[in-house]
């Protein structure tokens, strides 16, 4: 035996593989206010005890590896390791468990969602001892929240910039999403804004393709915005998509948008990445631009019930990284969204303090302290008949975005925008008068359509349209 080996042995190092639960399962641990807390839905492989599976998640997402290493003795594992401190079975599921893990704050770089996710939702999701793993929720401690700028401006500052109060904001995604020339695209933007919408939107697929380069689109959309503003006397905006293949190109587009004097730009935060998104959010605050966020790719991550990551975690991450709007499900329409769960992460986006409420999928109390709120965006298969439900469910602090529900109007874009604006104003007035939109909504829309031919035509076109499928996102 060499002297070196003897030294290691005498120091107490013992090579080999040992159960994770001996080090990382600590049911007696009392969580600290500074810990990041995670709730994982764990599906262990057959024969793997839930305690070992939960401990493996804590280990592999913090300081652990598959075997004992002598360098463990050069640091304080008790200070830096993640701890699985509680496990509970999932009701109605035979082999699924919720494992609660606490992470010391020192494991994470300040102000970096990228670093936080690299640890918590990194290699551990491919771990062989687990059949599946889903991150259901995170508790971000105040000490970590305060290292983030968050949304560039937030809900109240946006309303002040736009001078729009007391109602949801109205938007529309320009269709067809691909193939229009820049000039025809700008024309569609102008007609929608002139008709009464607050915003129009680049589809997330629109970046800078051969049929419409980004600079041409920005110029024609800016022209449409200024023309519509002059005619209506209202502040208008178009979500100019700054998403690009490189961060440098993304910033070039944001700078050009600022030079044009438009109020808002857009970013695909999951396909673009959190580092790019946080960079853009910082620029937007410094330069007075609002930032609209699209969540393209989210369903790849969040749609399966037993593996991946719930959207409430992605919503929290966006609030930390930065965005003034984000698409967040409709409850009605064509896209996924179960009511109580959706309202849970809507509160996580908008409110300063959100209590734990398992009936809405909220596993931890979350305190955002001074981090600004994010406006949730409703889009996907919605039309004028949905307006009462959307107004009643989501209240004033939301953006209602009707793509086909505007551009599909039989008389064209501007009448489609008029129909949506009239329907919204009628619903807001009825609500303010104390009427029950859940019960009287259709009557409110019918009454308004008697003096708005544009709304009457829209009501006729979409009276039979429904999207009736069972929601996959259930508790």
UniProtKB/Swiss-Prot annotation:
PTM annotation (N6,N6,N6-trimethyllysine): residues: 14
Organism the protein comes from: Viburnum acerifolium
Role played: RuBisCO catalyzes two reactions: the carboxylation of D-ribulose 1,5-bisphosphate, the primary event in carbon dioxide fixation, as well as the oxidative fragmentation of the pentose substrate in the photorespiration process. Both reactions occur simultaneously and in competition at the same active site.
PTM characteristics: The disulfide bond which can form in the large chain dimeric partners within the hexadecamer appears to be associated with oxidative stress and protein turnover.
EC number(s) on file: 4.1.1.39
Record protein name field: Ribulose bisphosphate carboxylase large chain
Additional detail: The basic functional RuBisCO is composed of a large chain homodimer in a 'head-to-tail' conformation. In form I RuBisCO this homodimer is arranged in a barrel-like tetramer with the small subunits forming a tetrameric 'cap' on each end of the 'barrel'.
UniProt KW Coiled coil keyword: no
Residue numbers of N6-carboxylysine PTMs: 201
GO CC aspect terms: chloroplast
Compartments where found: Plastid, Chloroplast
HAMAP family hit by this protein: RuBisCO_L_type1
